[in-house]
Amino acid sequence: MIASLRGKLLQLEIDRLVVEVSGVGYEVMIPFPLHLECKDKLNTEIYIHTFHSITDRGQRLFGFGSKKDRESFELIKSLHGIGELTALKILSFFQADDLYQIAKADDKKTLEKIPKVKGKTSEKILFEIKQNLKKFEMFLNEGTTESSFVDRETDLATLALIQLGFDEKSATKQVADAKKLNPGLSASDIVKQVITGTR
């Protein structure tokens, strides 16, 4: 099993990267936070933790910036009805400690900031997290607070716009402009303002 990779970053996209190790290029699926970490590291050496998936449909590598993120991914994908790609999508928006706080507060609205996670889908995910709350509690840090995920509103809004069809440069600028005018905006409010053209 491939648990980690160290090598030159050859290619970087929103949801994947290619890292060259000893002359071999490995394509790795990644969450959005790792994409942000790697933005300025093309053609330089990187180190990532990986989860090596082997199924009847083939093999895939998933990459993470920390061991904790990889363990969060493994926990999320172990929930009933949640596959690897859905788990990666969730991890692009929220870490395991965020999900713990969301479930404790029964905050379906926050969970629905993830594109296409609405209605019965968000209810099912929330239910599964609640059923495994003790496991998610293990990811809490001493500094974790009820509003810890609020600090990532900018990243949430940027990713949401990209998934709506904006290119990354435009999405980043639009979000920065909106936050400059009103620093207290939530991710969903930023996205609404950008789409409607209001400020």
Curated annotation (Swiss-Prot):
What the entry lists under HAMAP family is as follows: DNA_HJ_migration_RuvA (MF_00031)
GO biological-process terms attached to the record: DNA recombination; DNA repair
Domain I as annotated region, ranges: 1-65
Query: Which protein family is named in the record?
Result: Belongs to the RuvA family.
Q: Which residues form the signal peptide?
A: none
GO molecular-function term, one example from the UniProt record: ATP binding
Functional description taken from the UniProt entry = The RuvA-RuvB-RuvC complex processes Holliday junction (HJ) DNA during genetic recombination and DNA repair, while the RuvA-RuvB complex plays an important role in the rescue of blocked DNA replication forks via replication fork reversal (RFR). RuvA specifically binds to HJ cruciform DNA, conferring on it an open structure. The RuvB hexamer acts as an ATP-dependent pump, pulling dsDNA into and through the RuvAB complex. HJ branch migration allows RuvC to scan DNA until it finds its consensus sequence, where it cleaves and resolves the cruciform DNA.
Q: Which gene underlies this protein?
A: ruvA
Keyword Cytoplasm part of the UniProt annotation: yes
- How does the annotation summarize its subunit structure? Homotetramer. Forms an RuvA(8)-RuvB(12)-Holliday junction (HJ) complex. HJ DNA is sandwiched between 2 RuvA tetramers; dsDNA enters through RuvA and exits via RuvB. An RuvB hexamer assembles on each DNA strand where it exits the tetramer. Each RuvB hexamer is contacted by two RuvA subunits (via domain III) on 2 adjacent RuvB subunits; this complex drives branch migration. In the full resolvosome a probable DNA-RuvA(4)-RuvB(12)-RuvC(2) complex forms which resolves the HJ.
* Chain positions covered by the region annotation Domain II: 66-144
Entry remark concerning the domains of this protein: Has three domains with a flexible linker between the domains II and III and assumes an 'L' shape. Domain III is highly mobile and contacts RuvB.
Protein name in the entry: Holliday junction branch migration complex subunit RuvA
UniProt keyword list: Cytoplasm, DNA damage, DNA recombination, DNA repair, DNA-binding
Q: Keyword Glycoprotein: yes or no?
A: no
Region annotation Domain III: where it falls in the sequence: 155-199
Location in the cell reads: Cytoplasm
Q: Matching CDD domains, A to Z?
A: UBA_RuvA_C
Top-level division of the source organism's lineage: Bacteria
- Region feature (Flexible linker): 145-155
Might you report a single GO cellular component term? cytoplasm
